[in-house]
C-alpha cells in the first residue's frame, strides 16, 4: 500500500521544489504588481466566503500569502496529498478518531446499514469551514432522515503560531490530544447537530483522506460515494446536497 519510501521521498523533494518556486514567483509578482496580485487573491477569497466576512479586511489575510508560514503550510498540504488513499468507489479508510469525551473509536463506527455517512473535515481557524458551517447544518436538517453526519476536527489551518490571519479565531497548533479536544469543543457553541470527533495526533484521518485544510466526503457501506475537492477554494457543501438528493430520488 502507498508509495515505496524512496519514491515517496523523491516526490516530496519535487513538491518542495515546486512550492519553493511558486512562493518565490509569488513574492516577486507581489512586489512588482501588488494590486493585480491582491485582486487575484481576493477573487479566490470570494469562493471561500472570507472576502465577505467583516472580520477579515483585506490587510488581515492577503499580505500573509507567500510568507514563510504560508510556504510551510502549503508544503504540508501538498505532501499530505501524496499519501491520499481515497478515490470514488474505493474503500473508505477506517481511521481511528477520538470522541470529545476522550473515547477512541473509528470512522466506520458511525456508519449505519445502507445510510450514507457525510464526513466534514476542518478546524475553527479555517475561515471557509466556519463561513459555510450553516450550509452544512442545513444539510443535516434536510437529510437527517436518510443520512448520518460526522465532523472530524483536524489540525488547525491558520493557527495563531503558524500561518495566522489577523482577527481570526485564536488557537495555537495542537501540541497534544487535549489541545485538539479543547479546540474542537468550540464548535459546540455553533450547535453542530451531529457528532464531533477529533483526528489522532498522528493526523491519520487527515493524511489518508487528504483532508487538510478542509474536505467533504460521502461514504456508504464502507465505500466512497463522493470525494469533494480540497478546501479552501473548492470546499462546497452544496455538492453534498446534490449527491444526497440524487440518492433520495
UniProtKB/Swiss-Prot annotation:
Residues 1-12 are extracellular. Pfam families: T4_deiodinase. Keywords: Cell membrane, Endoplasmic reticulum, Membrane, Oxidoreductase, Selenocysteine, Thyroid hormones biosynthesis, Transmembrane, Transmembrane helix. One of its GO terms (biological process) is thyroid hormone catabolic process. The active site is at 126. Its EC number is 1.21.99.3, 1.21.99.4. The chain crosses the membrane at residues 13-33. It is found in: Cell membrane; Endoplasmic reticulum membrane; Basolateral cell membrane. One of its GO terms (cellular component) is endoplasmic reticulum membrane. InterPro entries: Iodothyronine_deiodinase, Iodothyronine_deiodinase_AS, Iodothyronine_deiodinase_I/III, Thioredoxin-like_sf. Residues 34-249 are cytoplasmic. It catalyses: 3,3',5-triiodo-L-thyronine + iodide + A + H(+) = L-thyroxine + AH2; 3,3',5'-triiodo-L-thyronine + iodide + A + H(+) = L-thyroxine + AH2; 3,3'-diiodo-L-thyronine + iodide + A + H(+) = 3,3',5'-triiodo-L-thyronine + AH2; 3,3'-diiodo-L-thyronine + iodide + A + H(+) = 3,3',5-triiodo-L-thyronine + AH2. GO terms for molecular function: thyroxine 5'-deiodinase activity; thyroxine 5-deiodinase activity. It is a single-pass type III membrane protein. Predominantly monomer. Can form homodimers but homodimerization is not essential for enzyme activity. Plays a crucial role in the metabolism of thyroid hormones (TH) and has specific roles in TH activation and inactivation by deiodination. Catalyzes the deiodination of L-thyroxine (T4) to 3,5,3'-triiodothyronine (T3) via outer-ring deiodination (ORD) and of T4 to 3,3',5'-triiodothyronine (rT3) via inner-ring deiodination (IRD). Catalyzes the deiodiantion of rT3 to 3,3'-diiodothyronine (3,3'-T2) and 3',5'-diiodothyronine (3',5'-T2) to 3'-monoiodothyronine (3'-T1) via ORD. Belongs to the iodothyronine deiodinase family. This is Type I iodothyronine deiodinase. It comes from Oryctolagus cuniculus (Rabbit). The gene is DIO1.
